[in-house]
């Protein structure tokens, strides 16, 4: 139950780009007291640009559509996440925790740090990512981009087949380390 002193000052903030898998579009909305909304609007107008018109139109159409699609997408994301977590944790030298949000997995590569690939030492997440891309054509984001050295970020916002093929190539890459 809400304290009486908070009534009238509550805010509702909703993200549409994540809920409807509009990756990178950064669109949502907020509802609340006029004074706070004006302050947020002022800050936002000086800090970032506005959402593009295509993203705004897509968000509007998504809100007007059947919400069952969100439930269906969530189920697909969960299936991909669970399959990827299981596969990653079966690869010697790699591990991950089951993510609770978004559609990214932080791949722990510390178990392969110090090993070599074609004579090059895996001394950072950047090196791991570069070699993986160059030789196996799998793109991951090195953890140093998130101040998470020793990790690489994987996305499961693609088809299950793409996720599993990427992991097959990562496993092949890791098996070739010396």
Give the ranges of each region predicted by the language model.
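Single conserved hydrophobic/aromatic residue that forms the stacking wall/gate
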Residues: 1-10
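PLP-dependent class I/II
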Residues: 9-178
């Amino acid at each position: 139950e809400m304290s009486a002193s908070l009534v009238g000052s509550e805010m509702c903030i909703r993200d549409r780009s994540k809920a409807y898998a509009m990756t990178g579009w950064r669109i949502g909305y907020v509802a609340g007291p006029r004074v706070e909304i004006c302050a947020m609007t002022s800050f936002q107008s000086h800090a970032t640009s506005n959402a593009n018109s295509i993203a705004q139109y897509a968000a509007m159409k998504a809100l007007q559509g059947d919400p069952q699609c969100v439930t269906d997408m969530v189920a697909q994301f969960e299936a991909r996440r669970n399959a990827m977590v299981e596969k990653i944790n079966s690869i010697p030298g790699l591990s991950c925790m089951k993510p609770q949000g978004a559609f990214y997995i932080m791949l722990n590569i510390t178990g392969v740090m110090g090993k070599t690939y074609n004579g090059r030492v895996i001394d950072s997440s950047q090196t791991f990512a570069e070699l993986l891309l160059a030789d196996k054509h799998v793109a991951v984001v090195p953890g140093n981009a998130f101040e998470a050295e020793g990790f690489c970020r994987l996305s499961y916002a693609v088809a299950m087949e793409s996720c599993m093929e990427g992991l097959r190539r990562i496993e092949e890459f890791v098996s070739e380390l010396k």
